[in-house]
């Protein structure tokens, strides 16, 4: 009998596996689908099905990502797994595959390695809200004390990057044992324990519709006798006719009232996350608004010109720069719908940035942009993308 499609009645959550190369991220992904398939919550996907991940493009960057889906009693999950380290870096920075939480895979035989650190740092910088740890390959370690040492080391590492290292669930097991049905305790049972930890510890993300209203302005029209209409896709929240909203970014913040919402030439009483709408603004002149500003719920987001970010710089092969850049490099930063020029300040001790690097840096824009932590952007030179970034913290 063929399985029916997943019912979308359960709350949905996006997760992904992160960690050092060869610590078992893809094997774990396969093992989760295998164990959950027994309960009817997934379709088993073997290692090689997941490993040959298709390429996709996000913000002008090609990334290989494998997507699998499965469900537990509690939730429906979309799970991303990347074949190579560079794909992880690109994925996390561009937000191509949103992660509401991540499963950090650490080999018990090796302990934390350089990419373990780097992925934890990236998770912190791009705002992954919660991590759960799977200590893999425990069947290769006979010494209980060694396992405890590795666990301690992982907890200390997490704490050093501002994650709650003492509280994060760490599940010991073996993805291979689950795939080969060799040791039920380290295999099957450990996977179920891990999924229970993911269910309980990774918070349910707030739906875009429940967040405060925000719409990036794409176009501005003036309609005789009616006033000024701005169009765009509502990014989050709901706007109701008659509500006061703010126009933020590029210029001084203005207050206005939304006197009409139009979609597909029909008048509506509200627009919500995902809708492409035209919003009629009371008393706003055509020249008072421009592409690149946002409409937002008053007080929910503020304009800023200086921020710290994490960025990935494209290689020459990816269509990026052929040469490194230095402090005071001035490209354009493309936020939502517009480019703003900004100056880059590299961290102390970093002389230059090579194509293919990922780097934390500070940016000073020439005009303010409505931003909060986690906002994604592209770095461009004369219209071509040379990098991608995410706001890690706001300076001013």
Curated annotation (Swiss-Prot):
NCBIfam families listed in its UniProt record: EF-Tu, PRK00049.1, PRK12735.1, PRK12736.1, small_GTP
Reaction(s) this enzyme catalyzes, per UniProt: GTP + H2O = GDP + phosphate + H(+)
UniProt subunit comment: Monomer.
Chain residue ranges for the region called G1: 19-26
Enzyme Commission code: 3.6.5.3
Protein name: Elongation factor Tu 1
GO terms for cellular component: cytosol
Region annotation G4: where it falls in the sequence: 136-139
Ranges for region G3: 81-84
Described purpose of this protein according to its UniProt entry: GTP hydrolase that promotes the GTP-dependent binding of aminoacyl-tRNA to the A-site of ribosomes during protein biosynthesis.
Underlying gene: tuf1
Molecular-function annotations in GO: GTP binding; GTPase activity; guanosine tetraphosphate binding; translation elongation factor activity
Region of interest: G5: 174-176
InterPro entries in UniProt: EF-Tu_GTP-bd (IPR041709), EF-Tu_GTPase (IPR050055), EFTu-like_2 (IPR004161), EFTU_2 (IPR033720), G_TR_CS (IPR031157), P-loop_NTPase (IPR027417), Small_GTP-bd (IPR005225), T_Tr_GTP-bd_dom (IPR000795)
S-S bridge residues: none
Chain residues that bind GTP: 19-26, 81-85, 136-139
Boundaries of every tr-type G domain copy: 10-206
Localization terms from the record: Cytoplasm
HAMAP family: EF_Tu_B
Keywords assigned by UniProt, alphabetized: Cytoplasm, Elongation factor, GTP-binding, Hydrolase, Magnesium, Metal-binding, Nucleotide-binding, Protein biosynthesis
One Pfam family per UniProt: GTP_EFTU_D3
């Amino acid at each position: 009998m063929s399985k029916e499609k997943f019912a979308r009645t359960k709350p949905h959550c996006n997760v992904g596996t992160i960690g050092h190369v060869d610590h078992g991220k893809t094997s774990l992904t396969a093992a989760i689908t295998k164990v959950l398939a027994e309960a009817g919550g997934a379709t088993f996907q073997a290692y090689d099905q997941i490993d040959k991940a298709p390429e996709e493009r996000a913000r002008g960057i090609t990334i290989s990502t494998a997507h699998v889906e499965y469900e537990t009693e509690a939730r429906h999950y979309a799970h991303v797994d990347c074949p190579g380290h560079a794909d992880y870096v690109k994925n996390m920075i561009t937000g191509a595959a949103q992660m509401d939480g991540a499963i950090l895979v650490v080999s018990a035989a090796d302990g934390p390695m350089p990419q373990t650190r780097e992925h934890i740092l990236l998770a912190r910088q791009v705002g992954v809200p919660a991590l759960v740890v799977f200590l893999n390959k425990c069947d290769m370690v006979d010494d209980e004390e060694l396992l405890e040492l590795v666990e301690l080391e992982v907890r200390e590492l997490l704490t050093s990057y501002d994650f709650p290292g003492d509280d994060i669930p760490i599940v010991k097991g073996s993805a291979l044992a689950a795939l080969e049905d060799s040791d039920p305790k380290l295999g099957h049972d450990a996977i179920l324990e891990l999924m229970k930890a993911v269910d309980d510890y990774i918070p349910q993300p707030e739906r875009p519709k429940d967040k405060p209203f925000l719409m990036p302005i794409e176009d501005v029209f003036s309609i005789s006798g009616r006033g000024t209409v701005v169009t765009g896709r509502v990014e989050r929240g709901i706007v109701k006719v008659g509500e006061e909203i703010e126009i933020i970014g590029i210029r001084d913040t203005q207050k206005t009232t939304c006197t009409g919402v139009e979609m597909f030439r029909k008048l509506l009483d509200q627009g919500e996350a995902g809708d492409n709408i035209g919003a009629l603004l009371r008393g706003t002149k055509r020249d008072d608004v421009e592409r690149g500003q946002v409409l937002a719920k008053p007080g929910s987001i503020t304009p800023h010109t200086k921020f710290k970010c994490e960025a990935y710089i494209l290689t020459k092969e990816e269509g990026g720069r052929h040469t490194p850049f230095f402090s005071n490099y001035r490209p354009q930063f493309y936020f939502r719908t517009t480019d703003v020029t900004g100056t880059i300040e590299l961290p102390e001790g970093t002389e230059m940035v090579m194509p293919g690097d990922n780097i934390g840096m500070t940016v000073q824009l020439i005009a303010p942009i409505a931003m909060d932590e986690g906002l994604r952007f592209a770095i461009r030179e004369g219209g071509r993308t040379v990098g991608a970034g995410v706001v890690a913290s706001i300076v001013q």
